[in-house]
Amino acid sequence: MARIGVENSLTDVQQALQQQGHEVVTLNSEQDAQGCDCCVVTGQDSNVMGIADTSIKGSVITAHGLTTDEICQQVESRT
């Protein structure tokens, strides 16, 4: 399964992705995003960790306004 970086305040998303079998990495700094297939951020501050300027392999999903299920669906479609 995919390696997904998830901002630490999104614990429900972390748990749901782990239940689906993904490797979940908590994003505390820009370095945590390296090696991730996809990252999920809150969107409250679109560049809180510099991810917008970082060239990670995968896409960045903004969780703002989405349910946990919708976020998981986006992760599945992008990995």
From Swiss-Prot:
**Pfam families under this entry?**
UPF0180
Tell me what this protein is called: UPF0180 protein BCB4264_A1446
Coiled-coil stretches are none
Give the UniProt family note.
Answer: Belongs to the UPF0180 family.
Q: Which NCBIfam families match?
A: PRK03094.1
Signal peptide residues are none
